[in-house]
C-alpha cells in the first residue's frame, strides 16, 4: 500500500499545475453541453472526479448554478479554487475532497452529473450503479470513458490494456451497459484525438522534462509509464479513445 500511495503522490505531482489531468477540450465540452436536453432552471450540478476544475469552471460559466466539484486530491481542488477566484466564480463551486465511490448525498439530488475521464477509477459499471441513485427523475449524466472503437483491437493495444485498464470495453458494450443500468443513452460523441495532444500530453511533456532524471525512482516509474501511454496512443489513436456518453435516468 505504501508503494501505491507513493506512486499516486508522484502522479499528482507530475500533473500539478496543468489545466487538465486527462484528455479533454473546452470547445468540445461546450459542444456536449449544447447537446443536453433541457434542464431545470438553476440545475443542481455535480462534477465528479473534477481534477483541477476544467469541467467545473465551464459548467459554472454556462449555468451560473452551484457546482459540487468532487476529487480525492486537495492539490487539484485548491488549484481549481484559485482559478475560480481569478474568474470570480468561487461562490459557484463547492470543492469536496472525498472518494467518488462513496458519496453520501441524498438520492435524487442532482439534475446534471458530469464526469470526464474519472469513472474508470471505480470502473464504468461501478460508476453507473453508484451514481444512478443520485440523479433526480429525468436527470442527465455526461460520463466520458476510454473504450475501443471496434471489436478489432490490435494485439499490442490489447496486451497493454490488460494491465493498464483491464476493464476497458467497446463503445457498443458500454452503450448496452448504460441502457441496463437505469439510464438511456441519448448520444455518444468521441473526443477528437487532437484534444489528447493539445490540451493534455503536450503540456504534460513540460512537467516530464522538469521532473525527469531527478533521482526519484518513483517519479521516474510514473514518467516511464506515462511515456509508454503516450507512445501507444500516438500509434493507435484510431483504435481507442474517450467517448462522451450523454444519458438520462429512467
What residues fall within each predicted segment?
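Conserved alpha-helix/loop element of class I SAM-dependent methyltransferases that forms part
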Residues: 22-41
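Class I SAM-dependent methyltransferase SAM/SAH-binding core
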Residues: 46, 52-102
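A short SAM/SAH-binding and catalytic strip from SAM-dependent methyltransferases
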Residues: 112-125
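A short glycine-rich, Lys/Arg-flanked "PGG" loop and its adjoining helix->strand segment in the class I
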Residues: 126-140
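A short acidic, Gly/Pro-enriched loop at the edge of an enzyme's catalytic core
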Residues: 101-112
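Conserved Class I S-adenosyl-L-methionine
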Residues: 189-250
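Short, glycine-/aromatic-enriched active-site segment of Class I SAM-dependent methyltransferases
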Residues: 146-165
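Short alpha-helix
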Residues: 167-182
Amino acid at each position: 500500500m505504501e508503494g501505491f500511495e507513493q506512486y499516486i503522490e508522484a502522479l499528482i505531482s507530475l500533473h500539478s499545475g496543468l489545466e487538465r489531468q486527462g484528455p479533454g477540450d473546452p470547445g468540445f465540452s461546450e459542444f456536449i453541453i449544447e447537446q443536453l436536453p433541457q434542464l431545470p432552471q438553476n440545475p443542481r450540478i455535480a462534477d465528479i472526479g473534477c481534477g483541477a476544475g476544467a469541467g467545473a469552471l465551464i459548467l459554472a460559466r454556462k449555468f451560473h448554478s452551484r457546482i459540487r466539484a468532487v476529487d480525492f486530491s486537495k492539490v487539484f481542488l485548491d488549484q481549481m479554487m484559485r482559478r475560480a477566484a481569478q474568474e470570480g466564480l468561487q461562490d459557484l463551486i463547492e470543492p469536496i475532497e472525498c472518494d467518488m465511490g462513496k458519496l453520501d448525498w441524498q438520492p435524487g439530488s442532482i439534475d446534471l452529473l458530469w464526469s470526464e475521464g474519472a469513472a474508470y477509477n471505480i470502473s464504468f459499471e461501478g460508476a453507473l450503479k453508484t451514481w444512478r441513485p443520485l440523479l433526480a427523475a429525468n436527470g442527465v449524466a455526461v460520463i466520458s470513458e476510454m473504450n475501443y472503437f471496434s471489436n478489432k483491437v490490435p494485439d499490442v493495444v490489447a496486451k497493454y490494456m490488460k494491465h493498464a485498464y483491464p476493464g476497458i470495453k467497446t463503445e457498443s458494450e458500454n452503450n448496452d451497459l448504460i441502457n441496463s443500468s437505469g439510464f438511456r443513452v441519448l448520444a455518444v460523441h468521441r473526443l477528437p484525438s487532437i484534444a489528447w495532444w493539445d490540451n493534455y500530453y503536450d503540456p504534460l511533456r513540460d512537467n516530464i522534462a522538469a521532473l525527469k532524471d531527478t533521482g526519484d525512482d518513483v517519479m521516474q516509474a510514473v514518467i516511464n509509464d506515462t511515456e509508454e501511454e503516450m507512445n501507444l496512443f500516438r500509434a493507435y489513436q484510431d483504435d481507442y479513445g474517450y467517448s462522451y456518453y450523454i444519458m438520462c435516468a429512467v
